[in-house]
């Protein structure tokens, strides 16, 4: 039998190497994602099935093991001492166990530390409405939302309810009262928790992910009733985010949803993590603010015009992804080559580079 490395040693390696993720899979050594690239843990052996099982079972309790074996996959999170938390997706592949572990640092960074535009701080001051933070997996959505919630928590006397699967960043009540509910442990589903949320006297509700019609409908209702709602979507732009929310509804409901969204939507931050010169990654974001022009576009179903409105909306704090990338190149933070890799429109990027 192969001697498995201790899971604690691998978790310490994640933190030491400033990795974002650890991957465990039969037939490979433990793999780290460092600055966006996968690299093997130095001097680690290739893992066999027993080694992977030992590593994964070391971070599961008995109930969690049974869920994983029954359902074939399982999401959970756990604290690793004072060093951070890990969000885990354990699953089966080709008949063997495997897992992806993402590091969630204990320290919650500020909007400034994340490199996000100044206007993003104002999202925490909205009295009501819907704010979306969007992007692909691993784009820093949870980190940005944690920064906004932390700002509210330490500056305002609000009742904040988060509904997450699983809980990532943990918030200790400060000026605000923070309630964090984890799907499968504290509630059966996002939709069930959202139905209860309105009876819990919230000021702010965070929805970890809007995955289906019922969750999106609940988010709209909560925002319409005078609360501030933060939520995430796996979309790459403001226009795509709006279309995604509307398209989950049957055609006969879509005009009504457009009207509701046009009234409650406050802002969308669509972000990616871009490798910096040297090491590390920085958030690059498209920012949409719901001006009267934006609300009309949503109401009339003309989201194809959204990019143009964002490009000309700098006075309101809006900026396109390409403009953000150019600013980062000019600041010496990222290379022009990386900017091209993440550009929405390379011709537009080059035009902006020329000034």
Where in this protein do the model-derived segments appear?
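Short, flexible helix-loop junctions that flank or precede catalytic/ligand sites
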Residues: 1-355
């Amino acid at each position: 039998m192969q001697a498995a490395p201790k899971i604690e040693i691998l978790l310490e390696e994640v933190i030491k190497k400033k990795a974002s993720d650890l991957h465990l899979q039969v037939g490979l050594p433990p793999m780290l994602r460092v600055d966006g690239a996968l690299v093997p843990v130095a001097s680690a052996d290739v893992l066999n099935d027993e080694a992977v099982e030992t590593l994964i079972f070391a971070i599961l309790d008995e109930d969690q093991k049974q869920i994983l074996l029954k359902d074939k996959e399982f999401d959970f999170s756990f604290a690793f001492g004072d060093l951070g938390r890990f969000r885990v997706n354990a699953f089966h592949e080709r008949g063997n166990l495997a897992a992806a572990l993402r590091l969630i640092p204990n320290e919650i960074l500020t909007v400034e530390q994340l490199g996000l535009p100044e206007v993003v701080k104002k999202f925490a001051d909205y009295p009501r409405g819907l704010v979306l933070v969007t992007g692909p997996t691993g784009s820093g959505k949870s980190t940005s939302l944690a920064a906004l919630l932390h700002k509210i928590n330490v500056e305002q006397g609000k009742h904040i309810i988060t509904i997450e699967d699983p809980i990532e960043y943990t918030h200790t009540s400060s000026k605000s009262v923070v309630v964090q509910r984890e799907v499968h442990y504290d509630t059966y589903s996002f939709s069930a928790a959202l139905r209860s949320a309105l009876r819990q006297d919230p000021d702010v509700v965070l929805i970890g992910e809007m995955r289906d019609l019922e969750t999106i409908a609940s988010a709209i209702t909560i925002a319409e009733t005078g609360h501030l709602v933060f939520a995430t979507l796996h979309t790459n732009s403001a226009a795509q985010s709006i279309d995604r929310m509307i398209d989950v509804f049957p055609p006969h409901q879509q005009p009504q949803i457009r009207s509701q969204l046009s009234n409650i939507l406050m802002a969308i931050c669509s972000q990616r993590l871009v490798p910096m010169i040297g090491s590390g990654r920085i958030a690059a974001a498209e920012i949409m603010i719901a001006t009267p022009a934006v609300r009309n576009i949503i109401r009339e179903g003309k989201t194809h015009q959204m990019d143009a409105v964002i490009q000309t909306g700098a006075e309101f704090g809006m900026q396109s992804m390409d403009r953000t990338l150019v600013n980062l190149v000019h600041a010496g933070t990222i290379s022009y080559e990386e900017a091209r890799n993440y550009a929405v429109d390379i011709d537009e990027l080059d035009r902006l580079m020329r000034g």
